[in-house]
Amino acid sequence: MQYRSLTKKILAIGAGAALAMGALSVGAQDEPFKVGFVYVGPVGDHGWTYRHDVGRQAIEEALGDAVESTFVESVPEGADAERVIRKLASEGHGLIFTTSFGFMNPTVKVAREFPDIKFEHATGYKQSDNVSTYSARFYEGRAVIGTMAGMMTEKNVIGYIASFPIPEVVRGINAFTIAMRKVNPEAEVKVVWVNSWYDPGKEADAARALIDQGADIITQHTDSPAPLQVAEERGVVGFGQASDMSAFAPKAQLTSIIDDWDAYYVERARAAIDGSWESQDVWKGIDSGMVAFAGYNDSVPADVQAAAELVKEGIVGGTMHPFQGPILNQAGEQVVGENEVIDDEVLLGMNFYVEGVQGELPK
C-alpha cells in the first residue's frame, strides 16, 4: 500500500477562463473541498485504477481551486481498506470514493461513524443516507467484443482471464459468450481464474496457459496489460480492459472497453459542494458514455467493425439486449425464453455459466 499520496495536496492550477467559470459555479468558499479516493491497485496499472485516477483528475480540471483531491493506491480489500477510509474521513474529506467491490463493507462501516461525510462505492450494492453506489454496465461492452471475437477466431477457442467469481465478472463472461455464439455457434470460451484484480505475473501466466490450450483470442477481466503483452509476443490477438492498452500491444489489441468515470465524478463532486448530493444507485452503460471503446486496430475487418457498431447501436437504441433469450445454461437447459430479457435483479446476482463456457464456476 502506498501512503505517499495520502497527505499530498493536489491543487489544480492554471485552469483557464472556462474552467474558472466552472469552479465559480459551485460557489465561493474559504478552503477547497476535499475529495478522497481509495484505489485497489496502483495508479500505473494502465487499467481499472488508472481510469479512476483519470476521473479524479477530471474533478480538478473542472472545479479548479474549489477542490483538493487526494488518493491512496494499492489498498488491499479488507481491514486495511477500513483503516485507510477512516483516515481519509478523519482528515476532513467531504466526499470519498472507494473504488473496488471488496471495499463495500469497510465503506459502509466507516460511513456510519461519519454521517456528515458523503461516500461513493464502486460496483457495490449497499446504500445508506450517506453512501451511494455506482457502476457501469460493463457487460454491454463484453457483448460488443464478444461479437468481434466470434467473427475473428479461426480456432473457435477464446481465452478469458477472470479475477474473482463475483456476479459482475460472471455477467461479463456470459455476455461475451452469448454474443460470440450468436455469430459463431461453434466457438467456446475457456476461463482461467487468477483470484486477483491486479497481478501481472498471474495474468501473464494465465494468458500463456490459454494460448497453449488453443486460444487465438484473449480477453480479460483483470487490470494489467500483461495478457495483451503475452498475446503480442505469441502472435495472437485480444482486447484491452478498462483502458486503451494499445501502447503495450499495438498489434494484438483489437479494441478495448474503456471505463469513463469523468462526467460522473465531476457531477458528484459538484453536488457534494453545492449541497444537492443525495444517496443513489447508478448503473450506466454505453448510452451514457460510461462504457466506451478504444479505436479499432487496422487489422479488424470492415465487416467486423460494422457488426460491432450495430451491437452498440442496438444496445443504445433499446432494440438489442445482451441477455435477451433464448439463453441456455452450461448444461443446455433453457433459462431465458424466446425474446425474454434477464432483469437487473437476476443480473446483479448472476451465479451460473451459459452454454459455450468451459469448466466449472468456482464456488
Model-predicted regions and their roles:
Residues A12-G22:
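Bacterial N-terminal signal peptides
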Residues Q2-G14:
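Bacterial N-terminal signal peptides that target proteins for export
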Residues M1-Q2, G44:
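Helix-centric, low-specificity signal for extended rod-like, repetitive segments
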Residues A28-K363:
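A residue-level marker of the well-folded mature domains of exported/periplasmic proteins
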Residues Y3-L6, M21-V26:
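N-terminal twin-arginine translocation
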Residues K9, A17, V192:
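Generic anion/oxyanion-binding catalytic loop in active/binding sites
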